[in-house]
Regions:
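Adenine nucleotide-associated cytosolic modules
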Residues: 1-141
Length: 141
């Protein structure tokens, strides 16, 4: 399947801990290199705790902060890319469906041509309930 190079991309990542913390920098770099309109939304309701420092992509200065916010601010600052974060656990299907709903973009400021963004859902969570939620969303979208 081919997509036009100017078609926008939205990546929604659930989980910013052990897996998401290491996936996020690669997603940021990929979106930055693609050179197309992109949105990256990181979702996690957890905070950085001392036990996370040994195995997750956080430093002591991050302690007590929301994991999604830390990653969004760290990499968007470095790469100059606007990023959104949701400092909550996504536990209900309507909330997830709202996040993955493709938005319509105007492709060029002087054109009436519009297109919907491609949406990628990354499940970087460590619990089966959220994995099942992603499965439900996949079949309903």
């Amino acid at each position: 399947m081919k997509f036009p190079m100017d078609r926008p991309v939205k990546v929604v990542m659930l989980g910013a801990g052990g897996t998401g913390g290491y996936v996020a920098p690669y997603v940021f770099r990929l979106l930055h290199m693609l050179g197309r309109p992109a949105r990256f939304i990181i979702c996690d309701g957890d905070i950085v705790e001392p036990k996370n420092l040994d195995r997750q992509n956080f430093v002591p200065a991050d302690l007590g902060e929301n994991k999604a916010r830390v990653l969004a601010e760290r990499y968007s600052t470095v790469l100059g890319m606007e990023t959104e974060y949701v400092p909550n656990f996504i536990e209900k299907l309507p909330d997830l469906m709202e996040l993955i709903e493709p938005k319509e973009w105007e492709l060029h400021p002087h054109s009436s041509r519009r297109t919907k963004e491609m949406v990628l859902l990354l499940g970087c969570v460590d619990n089966n309930k959220t994995r099942q939620l992603c499965h439900q969303a996949f079949y309903q979208s």
